[in-house]
Regions:
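Portal/gating segments that form or line small-molecule/metal binding sites
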Residues: 8-140, 150-191
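Non-cysteine beta-strand/loop elements that form the S-adenosyl-L-methionine
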Residues: 147
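Short, Lys/Arg-enriched N-terminal segments with co-localized hydrophobic residues
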Residues: 1-9
């Protein structure tokens, strides 16, 4: 009889972001929706289906906690409202009011390591640019998925600001949507 070694799967931390050709990810409500179609909706559903928890930064949490609870529980609102949310902030005070929200105000690396060891699907990050940059810099981001929209916004909040450290990435998947949006999946190089 052969001994079976069960492989323990560790959850990944995966950031999924909308960005313009010039790197803007802020205020997607002003430039993203013209590219939404059934194909993009299917891609969004796939992203949601692979994760059962979210990491959010303070700014994204505050914006979304004032919006999503008022949208009901159908479609994206159901996912946002019912999914476990872990909010990284040194300035927010708990307990957090939005359903299924937990504050991470201590050692972020330790908290994420514990989350990754828990059973479940991946842990997603949507928005939360400062958190994405911090986790990528510190080696805590396992995957970066970018939906690069074929538009030059001309100004706005960039996903990667000037002055950051270089971080080599490896392209592991790419898909071109019918609207010209590129769906690119990267992992830290050598990881």
């Amino acid at each position: 009889m052969q001994d079976r070694i069960e492989e323990v799967s560790v959850r990944k931390v995966v950031a999924s972001e909308f960005v313009s050709l010039d790197g803007v990810f802020g205020s997607p409500d002003q430039w993203h929706f013209q590219y939404v179609n059934d194909e993009m909706e299917e891609t969004r559903k796939e992203i949601f289906a692979t994760a059962d928890a979210m990491l959010l930064g303070r700014t994204t949490y505050e914006e979304w906690a004032g919006f999503w609870p008022l949208q009901g529980d159908q479609g994206p609102a159901g996912y946002m409202n019912n999914t476990a949310k872990y909010v990284v902030s040194k300035t927010l005070a708990g307990p957090l009011e939005w359903n299924n929200s937990t504050l991470i105000d201590g050692d972020v690396a330790e908290a994420i390591a514990k989350l990754k060891q828990q059973p479940g699907k991946d842990i997603s990050i949507l928005g939360s640019g400062a958190l994405v940059r911090s986790l990528l810099r510190d080696g805590l981001l396992d995957e970066l998925r970018l939906m690069v929209h074929p538009i030059v916004v001309g100004g706005g909040k960039r996903l990667f600001e000037d002055g950051g450290d270089q971080k080599p990435l490896e392209l592991v998947d790419s898909k071109t949507l019918g609207t010209g949006v590129l769906y690119l999946t990267y992992r830290p190089a050598g990881g």
